[in-house]
Amino acid sequence: MATITIYLKYSGGDLQYSTDNVTYHDMTETSIVGANPGDTVMWTCADDSIDKINNINVGKTKTAGGNWKDIWSSKPAATDNTKRTYSGVVSTDPESPTNPALNGYDINYKIKNGGNVDKDPTIQVPQP
């Protein structure tokens, strides 16, 4: 099982992400490229522009049969008390959605020299 890391930073008045910690994009819509069932997905603060991630709430997505289903066997949770890294595991349930449907999630984080901020991007379901 692999680990996919999404690096987060606050720049230009918006939340930005990178999968290589080099090239950053505004977080609007993205795919967790290469995620397979059982893979761990980690969100981590790339620099001190974000003091901490307060929480990451993930939604459910629809299966081909039209039922709502979690794509996470372990929902994103803080890995330690600093709350600078969150980790979740992609479901291995064979009934989990495997088509590129959309799964909404919300990131609430605290910026340096500022308050709490919410970002509600749309993320594509990890592809098996």
PLM features: residue spans?
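N-terminal edge beta-strand
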Residues: 2-37
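Intrinsically disordered, low-complexity segments
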Residues: 16, 71-72, 85
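Predominantly extracellular/luminal cell-surface or secreted proteins
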Residues: 18, 46, 59-61, 110-112
